[in-house]
Amino acid sequence: MNKIADFNDLPFSPKKLAFSSEGYSLQFFCPENPDIVLDSISDSDYNKDQFLPYWAQHWPSAQQFLSYILQYPFKTDIEVCELGCGLGVLSTAFMIRKCKTFSIDISHHACRYSHQNIMLNGCIPKVLCSDWRNIGLNKRFDLIAASDIIYESRWVEPVLSCMNSMLLPDGKAWIADPCRRYWDPFKMRAKELGFILRTLKYEKVTEKKMEIEILELSRGKNRLLNQVLY
């Protein structure tokens, strides 16, 4: 276990979260008050890209996804990329399951939290602060994973384009979502572009009054997948 555990250098007054899932006990830090993270964004910075700090919370979809990852029988040496890694929870789970994992987020604050949280759980982080509209990573992966990233319509095309460019020919993408407004349009567009969709897990979370789906996307034979999507 890495001894860097006090996290005094992290911004936004971090608090500790502890999870027990599938026989694993994990710890993570997150901002104590997400509203403070939101308030830290200046009007000028917001107007540049209308970025909101969704990364600052551990969402129910990610919790369901965490359990799924921890029990999945992965092959050895699989290479994974998590888009929108946020707090690094899913990346940590993949690393615990011996997957070679890259973690990517547009927020440098999220990347700091992800980096430290991965180390806290005894893993070696590979974190890149980048935008999925232009990743700048010349590498392809066996699996691309993400949770709670289709929260705006403008992300549908860039996310699909990013997955297409970063997946190996026989690679797959796993995305978890609480069936928000743009989830069905995302799935429809993915089908139009030739992705094959399969539901890995679907669950109603009564106490949260939401439905969570973990979706797998793989390539079909549609030639559209070799084209630029936006």
Residue ranges and their predicted role:
Residues 1-230:
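S-adenosylmethionine-dependent methyltransferases
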